[in-house]
Structure formats: C-alpha cells, structure tokens
Regions:
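A conserved helix-loop-beta module that forms one wall/lid of the active-site cleft
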Residues: 83-94
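Active-site core segments that coordinate phosphate-bearing ligands/cofactors
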Residues: 2-10, 14, 20-55, 60, ...
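Short beta-strand to alpha-helix junction loop
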Residues: 70, 95-102
Length: 230
C-alpha cells in the first residue's frame, strides 16, 4: 500500500507527511477527527482569515501527500486511508493566483489598502530553485541551512522505486524532485564544537568556524573516501 501511495502522490511515507499525521490522528483520536469540519495548513488558514476564501496552491497541496502527482486531483487511495473528504480540504489553485479584496478587519489590522493583491506562491523548496535560477532540468539546487535538500525541476513526474526521492507538483507542467536531509548546517556546528581544538582557537584568537573552513579548504574533494552519516 505504501509503494502504491508513493507512486501516486510522489510523497514518501514519512512522519513529516500530513497524510501520515492525519492517519495517526484518525487512529489515536477518532472522536476529534470526526468532529473536524475542515483540514487546513497555515497558508490556507491565513488566506481564509484575510479574504474569507479556503484555498491553497498546488505545490502545498502536493506536499500533503494526498494529491495525485500526475493528474493534479486528490488521490482517492490517500483520502480513503485518512477518511478525509475532498470538501474538507482547501480548493487547489495555481500558485500565480491572486486574491484581491481584504476583509475590512484584516485590512485595518495591517494598515494596508483592501485592494492590495496577495499571491499564493509555492512551497519554500520550489521557490528556492526559482530564486537561484535552477529551473532547468539539468540544473540542481543544493540548499543547506539547519537542514538540507537537493532539488531539480523537471517537466514530468519522477518516481523513485526505492522511495528515496520526493516529487511534488509545482505549477504549469513543472515538478520538483529531490531528497531532504534533516541535518545540514547543524552538522557543521557539531563538528566545530567537537573536533576543533579549543586551545588553538584561543591561542590564535580566531573564530572556530574560520579555522574549520581553512582545514576543510585544504582537503581534496571526496575527502579520501571518508563517508559521514549524520
């Protein structure tokens, strides 16, 4: 069942997936699940409070793990598994869709004109590729913050038989394919704290991270075959 879900949605079965969380909620708190009228992410909730509409963009919908990555419709198998009905979810719109006409209270609270346009956009990973110009199928974007990810934009869904990659629909015949890593910059922080000689840093009066970067720069690509699994 998991392989079929992944093949349909492009989202690996993982605790971070909203589909997985909804399934847990259904099993652990069935009464709460039964009382819920709608299920929303932060963005669709904000648009509801600002404009009175219940919508989100296709990329966020794809990230739920319940959107069929090929057809762009809600996946029947995923919905049946969670017990969620399509009408309980936000309407899926293009990321370039604009909302104009803020509710009076919202416009007043933000002190902006009610006709200020708001655009739905996309999830952060897709927009990071756009931001660095990695929107061609032969260009890869690597993002390293606290966590990390490698992503490429394609013109068709890419499904990995081993479920190592995610594949999210973005918009207008584009998909983002990649792999996440829960450790990125924090691994560098850990390495500096545990591997850099504190006395050397103190004696040289230099920043520990600068010292680490100097050492790293002297090591050839591939680090002589060293593998590190954070």
């Amino acid at each position: 069942a998991g392989q079929q879900l992944y093949a349909s949605t492009g989202t690996p079965i993982h605790p971070m997936s909203p589909l997985t969380k909804l399934l847990w909620l259904k099993q652990a708190h069935p009464d709460l699940m039964a009382r819920a009228s709608y299920f929303a992410d932060i963005k669709s909730y904000l648009f509801y409070k600002l404009f009175g509409v219940f919508r989100f963009d296709v990329s966020i919908a794809s990230c739920t793990g319940m959107l069929n990555v090929t057809t762009g419709d809600w996946d029947e198998r995923a919905l049946a598994l969670t017990g969620v009905q399509p009408e309980q979810l936000p309407e899926v719109v293009s990321g370039t869709t604009q909302e104009i006409g803020l509710l009076p209270d919202a416009a007043s609270a933000m002190s902006i004109p009610a006709q200020t346009p708001f655009v739905y956009g996309a999830f952060d990973g897709a927009l990071s590729n756009l931001g660095v110009g990695a929107i061609e199928k032969d260009t890869v974007a690597i993002t390293i913050g606290t966590s990390a990810a490698v992503r490429v934009v394609t013109d068709h869904p890419v499904i990995d038989p081993k479920q190592r990659l995610f594949c999210y629909a973005v918009d207008n015949g584009l998909w983002v394919v990649g792999g996440p890593l829960n450790n990125g910059g924090d691994v560098f922080q850990w390495a500096v704290e545990h591997l850099v000689d504190a006395s050397a840093v103190q004696n040289e009066q230099i920043d520990a991270y600068e010292l680490a970067n100097d050492v790293i720069a002297s090591i050839p690509a591939g680090a002589h075959g060293l593998l590190f699994h954070p």
